[in-house]
C-alpha cells in the first residue's frame, strides 16, 4: 500500500480525567475564603471559566461570591503584593524629562505674566 493511501492513525494516549476544582461538598459562599481564593489571579482578577475548569453555573456563583466578599471587605479589589519595584534607568530618564517639561512650563508662564 502506498504511504499516501494509508489511513491516518492517531496514537492512543491514556486519558486521565481531572478532578473537578469544586467538590460536591464545597459550598460556594462569600464566607468560604479558602475556596474563593483559588479562583483569583495574582493581581486580584477573577480567573476565566476556561482556566478554572468550572461549569457555567459554578463560575457564575463563584463570581457573585467574590464580588460580595469584595464589597464586604473580606477580599481586596486589588492585591497588595503588586508593588512598584525600584526605579530603572528608563523610569529615571522619564522622570527627568517630565521635570524638565514642568520647569519649562513654569518659566513660560512667568515670562507671560511679566509681559
Swiss-Prot record:
Compartment annotation: Plastid, Chloroplast
InterPro entries, per the entry: Ribosomal_bS18 (IPR001648), Ribosomal_bS18_CS (IPR018275), Ribosomal_bS18_sf (IPR036870)
UniProt-annotated stretches for the region Disordered: 91-115
Biased composition (Basic and acidic residues): 99-109
Main subcellular location of this protein, as a coarse class: plastid
Keywords (A to Z) from UniProt: Chloroplast, Plastid, Ribonucleoprotein, Ribosomal protein, RNA-binding, rRNA-binding
GO cellular component: chloroplast; mitochondrial small ribosomal subunit
Gene Ontology terms: biological process: translation
Record bears the keyword Transport: no
Pfam families: Ribosomal_S18 (PF01084)
Gene Ontology terms, MF aspect: small ribosomal subunit rRNA binding; structural constituent of ribosome
Subunit structure: Part of the 30S ribosomal subunit.
Family: Belongs to the bacterial ribosomal protein bS18 family.
Protein's UniProt name: Small ribosomal subunit protein bS18c
Lineage: Eukaryota, Viridiplantae, Streptophyta, Embryophyta, Tracheophyta
Amino acid at each position: 500500500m502506498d504511504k499516501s493511501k494509508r489511513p491516518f492513525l492517531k496514537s492512543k494516549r491514556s486519558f486521565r480525567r481531572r478532578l473537578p476544582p469544586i467538590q460536591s461538598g464545597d459550598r460556594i459562599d462569600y464566607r468560604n475564603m479558602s475556596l474563593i481564593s483559588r479562583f483569583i489571579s495574582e493581581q486580584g482578577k477573577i480567573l476565566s471559566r476556561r482556566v478554572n475548569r468550572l461549569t457555567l453555573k459554578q463560575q457564575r456563583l463563584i463570581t457573585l461570591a467574590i464580588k460580595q466578599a469584595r464589597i464586604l471587605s473580606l477580599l481586596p479589589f486589588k492585591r497588595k503584593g503588586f508593588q512598584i519595584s525600584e526605579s530603572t534607568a528608563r523610569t529615571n530618564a522619564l522622570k527627568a524629562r517630565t521635570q524638565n517639561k514642568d520647569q519649562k512650563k513654569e518659566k513660560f508662564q512667568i515670562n507671560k505674566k511679566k509681559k
